[in-house]
Amino acid sequence: MKINKIILFFFLSCLYLFSSSVSAQQLLGEIEITEKSFTIDASVINTKINYLIDNTITKPKLSVTSIFGEATSIDDILRISDDKKSLTFGDYTSSTLSSSNKLVSKINLNSLILISFSTIITFGLFTKNNPRSSSKPLLFIVLLICISIFNLSNSIKISEVSVRIDIKVPSTFKFDSLILTLGSGSSIINGLIASSLKIDGCTTNSKDHSIELNQISISSELNICSTKEININEIQLTSTNVKLNLTSSSNVNLDFHNGYSGSFSINTNDLTLDSACETFKDSNTGIIIGTCNGGSDNSKLSITAITGKTVVSNAEITCPIDNSWRVTVGADNVPPSPSIITSQPATDFIFKKNDLVYMAQYGYSNQSITDGPVENSFIVSYPAYIPPSNFLVSKIIGSPTFKANVKYQFSISVKLGQPLGSFNRIQNMSLYFFNPRDITDPINGASQYYELKDTIPLFVHTFEGNFTSNTEFALTKIEFTPTVDIGTSIFGLRIFRTGFTGGDVVTVIIKDMKFTILPKTITQPTLLIKDSELVNLPKPSTSFDPQDSSTCPYLANDLVHWHNPSTWPNGIIPSPSSNITLPEGKKVLISPCSISQTQVYKWIKVPSTSELIFADSPMDFHVKDIYVEGKFIMGTTKCRYNSKINIIFHGEKTLSDTISQYYGSKGIGVSSSGFISVHAKQYHNTWSKLSASAWSGDYVVYIQDNVNWEVGQKVVVITSYYQDEDNNQNEVMTIAAIQGKTIQFTEPLKFFHYGGQEYQAEIALLTRRITFQSSDVNQFGGHVMVMGEGQFAGLGLIGMGQRNIKARYPLHYHLGKVLKNSYISDCSVTNSYYRCYTIHGTNNVTLTRNVAFDVSGHCYYLEDGVEMDNTISFNLAAYVHPIGRPAAGPSQIGEVFVESDNLRQPADCAASGYYITNAWNKIIGNTASGGWAGYAFPNLDKPIGNHRTVQMIPKAYSTKVFEGNTGHSSGHFFITGATIYVGANLTYNEVDGLLYYDSGRFERFTYKNGTVVYGNEVPMRFNNTKIYLSNFGIGHWGEYVEVVSYESHDNIRSASIFGEAWLSKAIVNGNSNNIARSINFNKQGFQYYDTYVKTVLSNISFRNYIRNPKSLNDEDDNRAIISMTHGDVFKPQGISTARAISFVNVAKSQIVGHQVLPTSGSRYFNFIDWDSSITGKKPGQPALVGSHELWYKFDNTCEYNSDWTCHICEKGNKEIANIQFIIPGLIDDGVLVYDSFENLNVGNISLFGSGITERRSTIVTKNQGVTGVSNMGWYLYLKAGSPKYMKIWLSQVVYGQHIFLALPYPTQTTFIIKSNYIWGSAINYNHVFSLASSAADVRSGNGTKYYFDGNFLYVKLVNLVLTGDPSEYYERDGVKVYWVRNSFSVSIEATNTVTPPTSDGFFKNLPDNLPSSSL
């Protein structure tokens, strides 16, 4: 048994070694081709020949790869002649191996190994103890078989060998002669340049060899014979004396690159020849002869395909090479527009399975709605024993929309899944339209639970129908008329059965469930005559750019044609697969016929002395890379092209620099010495706004501006919805007709788009005559990167940009420093994988009148923080998407994102329409829709990227000009997000080399010219700004800001501005007439901040803040002005003022919202109504508004407003004051204590004197700071007792004001009281207080005296440093807000030897009695 196993192992080893000796796909070797005349004889072998252009090599080479057969080395099957000019295939295994051709074949080696191995085993077996083993004869047989096999395999059968021959040459190499003698197989020859090419596949054997030639260039002779089909595509004849002889037993397809001029003789069964050739048939031979393009016999074409078909194409010379010839210039052919329709057809809005969610009290699952049996149908399944009511809820919010008092139609076809019975009988159905906040979210909700309780829908309509058949669908069609406009709503169809289901599942099949907007006559509505009530939104000039056709670049008389062989140094027009460098010093003109419009050009370089100029004629140009050191011209400022020219960029995703070093791949790179100019027809305006609202089902819209848009072009109608990213209501439409400012679409609108007086949806043109676009490969589009001057106008960029690869953006000025005449005007970017228009390390560039739609990452992008003095004007950015998970985070904190492969610029988690790292640029007349923010001003402490070593502070620069900009539908990802967001922090980490982006609150100090010097501070200024449908309209975390002339509509909050902040000349409108607005959110006009700011509101009209009885509290309700009451550690000082405030459709109860909480933020809330325009207290005179605490009831003018939960008083000679008690161990300086109210409470402070007898007090906590009314007595009582030492910062006791402070102490206490000013001064403010004669003497004194009456210590707190200088307050519009500064303090040190303080430093057990009311 053991010997049999050995024999089996031995035999299998033999077979394995034999099979390995004939394995395929093995590189046999390479040969360098050194001669320009070369012959290959492969007549005895099957070959697959590939001729390839390879610019990675400098000399031609030939490689041979085994496909099938026994060859293991090229020495086995070919020989090269001594003169290196020919190569012959054959069986050379029996030849004697020379010293220069040392080869031991794999087969011979295998044979040697196997025979040696066999001998050893055989010897061992024969010498074993059992000489009679019957296995020995079998072993001999196996051994003989193996030896025979390997002897047989040692001899190659060349006829059974198949190889691939790859001939690779650099693109500039030209053969004088290439001769191929072929056996069976195939040949594909691409890009060959030769004087003579001969391919013989006929004479040596009868085996078939197919031949395909693509884009070859021949200057003398082409001779091909094949028994199979011959295909020649785009052959280029580079002289006027070329002989072509083609012979085939099958078909011949001959395609010329630029025509053929010469004679021909064709013998074929079937001939197709284009009209450029004159033919006649020889009556004797039947051969067709003639000439093409009037040519002579200098060039001759002979084709023999007697049994086959011959096609000769593109024989016409469409591209003459005469330098004076020009292609016909493209005309400005504007498609005629039909008349605008006067009646609108019906429009159906069908609900399919994936549009709906099943909701009920219970009994729901993800199988409640499944696919139906026919188109537009679905099955509703009811499990056992469930209640009789359920909803089918639409996932499509806001489509369709319905006008009040207009008739609409709803239809549904129903078939029961089982015969009608008591468990599946449908009693009725109802159309419900819900406010989104009143129903489970059908899109993002995690539950299907819904129970109709006390919810009041926007509209409901109940109907009965034919719901009884289980054999066929029964149609129910009803009409309904809404009583209210229905915009942002969630539609639910309630199906109400007569009872619970039984023990079995029942089903209902529904088909063609739809709303129908009925046909109507189109009547032009009343159109807007201005776009804003208050702000002035500038518009670009109505003039078109002046044109002068005589200056067009293609008319120059010193141009040479791309398609002229003499243009090129080697006399050969380069093939697309080659690396092409334009000849030095030449201006090369490309016409449509100059190039292949289907082949992909690999790489084109324009040297510094050369120019590549395109004709103004329609063409498609497929290319991978273009590198421009000279000039790339496709139109100029004064010669815009009318033709449709399309450049399509190709290439797989790579990080390699295939254009040139640092320029990446798949696009155009323009060096610092280069210049690019692309100018297509000017469409103006590139975007406009609606002049009337457009409804679901509308075909016709009305716009505000004259435009020259065209039938067939695409436009986008921008959303009128808040949460743009969650519910895309931007609609791309095609123009069917256009007349003046009226546009008709080919399809109806699905959504409502608002065009009211408050604001209007934008409409933007997407189509352009010249386009750059990409073959879509893994979000790896083309890009244009310009380091020199670049001018672009009227260019469309589609599917461009390379996701998460820096510097690979659709259109990009890169490290250009200060440019002189560069701009991007009236261009469009759509469906971008990475940004829109980028300015990087470049100044003095203009981006104007451009459009961008559907973009990932920041759109208009200033990259490193050094970009200044650029103009960004009259542009549109819409539907901008954060990359990855959008930044969120609690409150003001935000989140930190770190640079990674999936988020190369971490700030893209908060992608914006306009990303402005340095504010010293002109931002004028733009609009932004969507995105995390519309306009983002991140904080950069220093530049990033290529400019990390530049010494500047980008965030220190203020706005150069920010004028007339609008934004909407953004800010909703972050609780304090805003459409204009001045916040977040972007830093470069020197340790790990990565960017870090923190999306939250960061302070920002801005200075004149960015020079950080005290006294040089200037505000960021935002003029004539309109923000709507936003979270916070403007969010500014900086220190200096002015917002002047501002409209806020439908924002959750109009603005959140900090530091020295002025909001003036504004309309703050809580609710517009836009039915698509966010009705599911409460809104507040403005929230006063809670500490260390100076806020002035002036000349503001608050409108349409309507009470919501379901609000959580007064701050959550729809109020015009609200407090900030969330915490104890931050104490409001006298920091908030207002003047000239008015209200429209705001009930008095909704003017102020103050939430009563046990926090210092709530207790100390206050503001000054400078002219009583808010309170109506004493018109023209200032009023003081204080919180709910009696502490603010400082005189008899004070009244408590229960709606506001605030006191309203005449201000008189009072001001808001703030002092900060520092008591070691109780109230520590600079320590923030977060704890419960009970643990924070350390005592109280009360008003006294001025006739006050009752307690008017508030709580004092462990967090420093007490705010109240100045020129009043303040009595401090601490539960721990009065301290032996305390310091009092006079943080805000303004000039001319004081606080008369009283504290209880035990009798016989003595005091040392001092004042201290922490800064140096020529005047001594450090005093030791003297003992006065009475409390009255202290109060009437200068603030350097004290008095102790045996019960109370009296000190008058006066900030002795103040003089009333304007530097002590912030003033705008005649309104002052005083500084809060901890620089002047008063310290009190108490000593009592009779009743000493306890060890913790307090005098205990003191009575709590108010000082005299007569003081």
UniProtKB/Swiss-Prot annotation:
Residues 1-24 form the signal peptide. Residues 566-692 form the G8 domain. Keywords: Glycoprotein, Membrane, Repeat, Signal, Transmembrane, Transmembrane helix. The chain crosses the membrane at residues 107-127, 138-158. It is found in: Membrane. Its main location: membrane. PbH1 repeats lie at residues 819-841, 842-864. It is a multi-pass membrane protein. Glycans are attached at residues 245, 366, 428, 466, 579, 844, 985, 1009, 1023, 1099, 1244, 1342. Pfam families: CEMIP_beta-hel, G8. It comes from the Eukaryota. GO terms for cellular component: membrane. InterPro entries: CEMIP_beta-hel_dom, G8_domain, G8_domain-comF-like. The keyword Ion transport does not apply. Belongs to the comF family. This is G8 domain-containing protein DDB_G0278975.
